[in-house]
Swiss-Prot record:
GO MF term (any one): histidinol-phosphate transaminase activity
The protein's annotated pathway: Amino-acid biosynthesis; L-histidine biosynthesis; L-histidine from 5-phospho-alpha-D-ribose 1-diphosphate: step 7/9
UniProt record, GO biological process: L-histidine biosynthetic process
Summary of subunit composition and partner proteins: Homodimer.
Family per similarity comment: Belongs to the class-II pyridoxal-phosphate-dependent aminotransferase family. Histidinol-phosphate aminotransferase subfamily.
Organism: Pseudomonas fluorescens (strain Pf0-1)
Full protein name: Histidinol-phosphate aminotransferase 1
Alphabetized HAMAP family for the sequence: HisC_aminotrans_2 (MF_01023)
The entry's keywords: Amino-acid biosynthesis, Aminotransferase, Histidine biosynthesis, Pyridoxal phosphate, Transferase
Length: 350
């Protein structure tokens, strides 16, 4: 703590990112990165951008990428917002659209950045408990609020809320912004972007870090009513007018255009997920239904922290959370077949 800190900094509780180990020999199944590389077309586009133009500022509107997103989802350009990763997009949403008199609502088990943003921007919140099966009950959100946000599929549980249930939440809070955080939607869910033209209070966020294998590039987006997008543009241009650099603009646009590679790699992850689930269940694990590129599992006879430590000794890193309700669960990213086999081998006989 420093005497130079602003008063509010002393009370901030920052987000703790997943471990990024320096040892390359470790099997890294803790941060939900895609085990398959980016689209070759995305890599080629970025390589072509390595030229003298890097001395120039990028397009502040990122029109190339914005056009690609709009075309992909069948929306208008003024319904698309872009940011330096979906975390930045979410930060602008909390700052510009969720600061109201009423507390905002989000699940008690969800993305741990949400309460961090609330602390950063002075937003009150009500953490709504998931049910006994770790699922959202839409009726629990039909109460006065200053906004609603939830990940779908949920992080860290992986459970998916059906589009009909998302619509139920929207209908229950027509005067509040409802944010659906779809970081993992491409691994088994149906995007709520199809609803944005019917619900002016709906904002859908996505990332290119997961299904499009561009976590190192930092590109996120939001799709919604033009009024909501304009608010985010105002925040962006009061903070950083150039969040998407030249490499990200061309690489992300090419990734959206390469549907064949996207479909192939998503299918591989889904196939591997089902294999991992079956292997863990054979070892006695309870595995929650997952529509993400990770699974959430616990063993009735073994402590989760102990299992995580055992796996680490075998060179496999998974994610363990200390939050009381999920302290006996492990979140395990889906890797390549070889990485997944290393996970199962590392667990040994239980």
């Amino acid at each position: 703590m420093s005497k130079f800190w602003s008063p509010f900094v002393k009370d901030l509780v920052p987000y703790v990112p997943g471990e990024q180990p320096k040892l390359t020999r470790l099997v890294k199944l803790n941060t939900n990165e895609n085990p398959y590389g980016p689209s070759p077309k995305a890599l080629a586009a970025m390589q072509a951008e390595l030229n003298d133009n890097l001395r120039l500022y990028p397009d502040p509107n990122s029109d190339l990428l914005k056009n690609a997103v709009a075309k992909y989802y069948g929306v208008q350009n003024n319904q698309v917002f872009l940011g330096n990763g979906s975390d930045e997009v979410l930060a602008h949403i909390f700052h510009g659209l969720l600061q109201h008199d009423q507390p905002i609502l989000f699940p008690d088990i969800s993305y741990s950045f949400y309460p961090v943003y609330c602390g950063l921007y002075g937003i009150t919140f009500d953490a709504v408990p998931l049910d006994a099966q770790f699922r959202i009950n839409p009726a629990d959100y039909a109460k006065p609020n200053g906004g609603i946000i939830f990940p779908n599929p949920n992080a860290p549980t992986g459970c998916l809320l059906a589009l009909e249930a998302v619509e139920q939440i929207l209908k229950g809070s027509p005067d509040s912004v409802v944010v659906v955080d779809e970081a993992y939607i491409d691994f088994g869910g149906e995007t709520a972007i199809s609803l944005v033209d019917r619900y002016p209070n709906l904002l859908v966020t996505q990332t290119l870090s997961k299904s499009r294998s561009l976590a190192g590039l930092r590109v996120g987006l939001a799709v919604g009513h033009p009024d909501l997008i304009e608010a985010l543009e105002r925040i962006k241009n009061s903070f950083n007018s150039y969040p998407i650099d030249r490499m990200a603009n061309v690489g992300a646009a090419a990734a959206f255009e390469d549907r064949e590679y996207f479909d192939k790699t998503c299918a591989l992850v889904i196939e591997s997920r089902e294999w991992v689930v079956a292997q863990l269940q054979a070892k006695g694990f309870e595995v929650l239904p997952s529509a993400a590129n990770f699974i959430f599992a616990r063993h009735p006879q073994h402590d989760a922290a102990g299992l995580a430590a055992k796996l680490r000794e075998q060179g496999v890193i998974v994610r363990h959370f200390k939050q009381e309700r999920i302290a006996q669960f492990l979140r395990i990213s889906i890797g390549t077949p070889e990485q997944n086999q290393a996970l199962i081998d590392g667990l040994g006989e239980l």
